[in-house]
Amino acid sequence: MKPPARALAGNLIWSADGGVWALWRVRPFAHAYCTTTERLAVHARLRGLLIGLPEQSMLLSVCERVEPWDVAADMADGVDLGEHQAWAEACRMTVTALTGQDLYRRRHYLAVELPGERRRAPWRRALRTAALDVVSTLGLAPAGVDQAEIASSRRQAQRLQVGLAQHIALEPVTTGEIRWLYARALRRGGQEPAFDQSWKPPRPARHDGAGGLLAPLVDAVVKEGGYRDDPDRPRHRRYVRIDSGRESTYATYLVVGDMPHQFTFPDGGGEWLTHLDDVGVPIDWCVRVRSIPNSEAQAKLRRQHRQLIGQVDEYDGEVSGAPPSLAEAITAIDDQRANLTANPAEPELQATTILSIADRDLDALEDRAEAITALFEPHDYGIFRPTGGQLALLRSMLPGTTTAPVCRDYTQFLLPGDLAAGAPYCGADLGDPCGLLLGFRVDTGTPTPVLLDPTYGPSVGRTASLAAVGALGSGKSYFLKRLCWDTIARGGQVVTIDRTAIGEYVTFADTTPGRCQVIRLSADSDVCLDPLRCFAGDERITVTLGFLSLLAGCSGRSEEGAALAEAVHHIAADSARLGDVIDHLHHAGDSTTRPDPAARSLARRLDHYRRLGPGRLAFGDGDPVQLDADFLVFWAPHLALADRDTLINEHLARQMLPEEILGHALIYLVAAVSRRVVFSNPTRFGAALYDEAWVLLASPYGQRLVLEGIRDGRKHNGAIWLASQHPNDLGAGELVDLLGTRLVFRQSHGAIDPATEFLGVAGSDDATEILRRGLPTGRCLLRDVRDRLGLVDIIPPISDAARQAADTTPTQQPTRSVTAQVDTSRPPQASDRTPPGSARTPTPQPPGPRRRRRTPLANVLDDTTGPT
């Protein structure tokens, strides 16, 4: 195949067809589950981008194949695999589990032809193209590009980028990425190459032609319509056969030939480019755009309007009159003229949308093409496969090429607002660039890995703290245990409180890597959690006051609160114990000179808690516990606790039993100790996990403790992880606003509105419908730290022991995972979901033999975990 370019320099392409193109990578907008207001805001930005495009441009989106080694490399990023053997083994096992699976993610690009090239004489462009063909036929390298032309083109591209970047985030691509785009176009459906650093040119770029850079990449035989002996060859040969190396693949190209005459945005028949993911197969798409200036477009429309008006008179003799289509055409032109007149800066866009799919099997390729047609036909979109124009469409999807003549037969005449309603560059990625493999996104048609880095939030100006809410048995605790295991394996530290009688986190601790420590909170425990001995500085006063105030039930503004504060400050000045505060209150209350009734009352109440069995944890004489393990579990199996309704109701709270009051105060004290442990070493990431967080958040002291932890976590390399059954358990104030990652699992119908508000998409019909239909166990709506939302299936831990320990579902036989709706041996497929209005999805073909790609990570893992 003829190389599409004669020279490359950074993100600049000197086209073999003449002209110079610039190519940028585009950061897409969030789209799924967004509210109408958010979508209209994105539409306005896309419209501004399209208005600013030069005469020739291309909007391109490709489905990049993700290799297992690439996922493992992202998992290992920032982790010393030699020191953390458990994570090295997890990476290796992940590669094994993903081998043979087809994983994809979208990349979006914008290519524009630099305007100056179009002003050159057409004969000069034609002569250059002919000369390049002769040079290529003789096997010679094409002529180089002089430095002056390169510098001039770069300045032009930079000026264009400055203007376009006001509407969308752009990043210039590298020469290696351009080479990869050209190479993958001829290898899709087979041994599709993955993008990595190996695509960088093998020698320093001297801008002396791209023959040596591109010729090997496009070294393939492309046959329009294939050959007679192609298996399952259809009657209408609307495909191309590509023979590259030792394999043969098939590709077909479809174009959008008809569109609805009218549609509304959003959710009114538009957004056709985002709906391509509903088919369930990897689809590349591009929109070839020619921008016509406003004045020129208006002149053309006036001529067309006169011609159509003249046709009306031709039907004067007809009894039925002019056909309705003629009146519709006149109305459409009137509307177009009115819009162009009202917006003099708005051009007319002549757009051709091309879709591309590929497969090893020709019969499967035909099924996929039929699925695309079946999805769009009911909505008045005409999808066509030009016979004899497949090769031209293939070349038209390569950046830096001119639009093929066949594209003109399927041109749609649109305004920028109309094309923006198609939602190009919408559908952002989900998750973090690196971290643990959390699961797979299941609302994008093709399985997409979702990574979660517990430490990523501060790098983008957000907190690392997160929260998960879900009904009983929805999978939120399973997710937290998965997060614990991976965080510890990556070198972090986690502290949690286990209130269950069966000790679910105690059992889980035995499966975690590193060293674990279980601290049982009971009357016979020999540990001491005295805040005056466990804390230092002002923190020991704050925590002591909070703990004793919860026990005494006094307010900081009352006389008792003032007396308690005086006693704590007096005792904290010396190396004292918590019991000394009660003794000081007794002394103040029984003073012969100035007895303090408030102090006497406080001393009597607190003395009772000192004598209670669990009270020895705070008032006892044991040694302070050493909290330096990788995973610390405070186990309180028999701690008496009031329910949430009692805690938030003032009347019921006054009727709490002493054991319940003490239990609630001890939970606060343990949470404070956990926070101190997590924030003690800024060089090591730590997290304090509070499952069933309503117990802690029901009191103002607990809320303040958690809020301070979320605020300070970014500075101390720590995080607070919260989980509860109802979104309202977390409140609706600044605590929720400051959270980073948020997850919503299955919810009851009454909790749907609070759940969407918790996710920040209140009013989103899509999110409401997803939650209303119900989520299977282990599936959740995830909002990442960059405010992108998606539907994710959480996968189980890679360790068999951790998988069984994390699952608390009562069963007579061990279960494989809590995500019962998902086969853990493979990523979720498009057939696992049935979105409203989606077309049938063809059964995916089993993957063919895959070539194992050796990477630097593979060599490291071989050294750390043995041969794979």
Where do the language-model regions lie?
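Extended, compositionally biased
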Residues: 54-118
